[in-house]
Amino acid sequence: MLVGLDIGRQYIKVVAMNKIKDGYKIIDAGQRLVPDPNQAFDPDKIDTHHWVMAIKELIRQQNMNPKKIKLMATGISGSSASVKQITTMEMPSEELESAMTFEARKHIPMDGTDAVIDYQILGSNDKEVDKIDVVLVACTKGVLNSHIDLLNESGLKPGVIDVDPIAITNAFT
């Protein structure tokens, strides 16, 4: 069973799927109001206990067994992460990794010492030869660790943690 979990401003949403011959089949989906609708999910300021209980209740309500989840995918909200598309020179993957760290510090407004940086190559640039389009993503280690801790305390093992604005794209690649 593959499970997607979205911790939103008003609802916690979950969808469970099984892989079938031609793709995926949704086997269950549900949502639950957040513990306190006046308190948006902020990893630095939340009362973890209430959020853990809400996630556990949603999983129980949907009759999902955390032990049967093969892959858990979840996202960090756009307000807790930065996303930027850039164009850069095409280069070997080893060089690209260090170049992306440099580019992220240049383009994404975050303290580089506390940032977790990732990137995804979109493909060749249509307008410039020998250049590629890349999406840079960054969040703080604190945000990422809070998200992982929340999932672990809820009895879930995170497999994929994405950034909400690009999660849907990555779900199908």
Locate each region found by the language model:
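Active-site neighborhood for divalent-cation/phosphate handling
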Residues: 71, 75-173
